[in-house]
Amino acid sequence: MRSDGRKEDQLRPVSIQRDFLEYPEGSCLISFGKTKVICTASVIENVPNWLKGKGQGWITAEYSMLPRATQQRTIRESVQGRIGGRTHEIQRMIGRAMRTAVELTKIGERTIWVDCDVIQADGGTRTAAITGAFVAVADAIIKLHKEGIIEETPIKDFVAAVSVGIVNDRILLDLNFEEDSAAQVDMNVVGTGSGRLSEVHTMGEEYSFTKDELIKMLDLAQKGINELIELQKKLYVIQDGKWERSELKEVSSTT
């Protein structure tokens, strides 16, 4: 039993509340336990210079954290005048994950700009951000189609992410901050609804792991990703390749 009462292979309670903000084309508030992230998707009628004239779109992402999202206040990166390496890494990870999910040639020469803002952090902020960002992006694409701006809903697959780690020689799913701080091995995995993996980040902290442990961690991550995607699926109706929103505004793993 873990400090928060979960089993080793158990996710924290997860909830997704769509349309959390009024103005973006897509938005949600996603919670992984105490970790809470606002994810938005904004449609910009432009693409980077290197894509102009090529007839395809782009998806990019920004990630930030409120100063008091953590137990001790952190200084805003905008005040420091630079974005840290961790933030750059997470932003790129979110962007890559979203581009895995969408056929960019079918959204026209426009950019979907994803913003993920952590309002409370207790571990797993990047995996929560990716899982929530998919909902924001999918809702934005459905809105574009409904308004007749694009001809299809070019969403290729669901995408979600989860953390796995080795803590006190035990392999655990969806680490909270306490567990993440003590982890011998930390892994973040991004996967799709078809069971494929799009990104795996793994590193040991003064600890080397075996191939058998790696496989066990990947298997556990796949279990968590499957559960997250089952939750995402409740928000959509898919028929003959066409995506529409379901009537649900909020889904939770506890209901």
From Swiss-Prot:
SUPFAM superfamilies membership: Ribonuclease PH domain 2-like, Ribosomal protein S5 domain 2-like
Q: What is the effect of changing T125A?
A: Poor processing of pre-tRNA-CCA-N(8), removes a few nucleotides, binds tRNA better than wild-type
> Which Gene Ontology terms describe the biological processes this protein takes part in?
rRNA catabolic process; rRNA processing; tRNA processing
Q: Which domain of life is it from?
A: Bacteria
The consequence of R86A is: No processing of pre-tRNA-CCA-N(8), binds tRNA as well as wild-type
Signal sequence, start to end = none
What PROSITE patterns does UniProt report for this protein, alphabetically? RIBONUCLEASE_PH (PS01277)
Supply the alphabetized keyword list: Nucleotidyltransferase, RNA-binding, rRNA processing, Transferase, tRNA processing, tRNA-binding
EC identifiers of the protein: 2.7.7.56
Concerning Pfam families, the annotation shows: RNase_PH, RNase_PH_C
Report the HAMAP family cross-referenced here.
RNase_PH
Which function does this protein serve? Phosphorolytic 3'-5' exoribonuclease that plays an important role in tRNA 3'-end maturation. Removes nucleotide residues following the 3'-CCA terminus of tRNAs; can also add nucleotides to the ends of RNA molecules by using nucleoside diphosphates as substrates, but this may not be physiologically important. Probably plays a role in initiation of 16S rRNA degradation (leading to ribosome degradation) during starvation.
Q: Which family does it belong to?
A: Belongs to the RNase PH family.
Protein name, per record: Ribonuclease PH
Q: Which species is listed as the source?
A: Aquifex aeolicus (strain VF5)
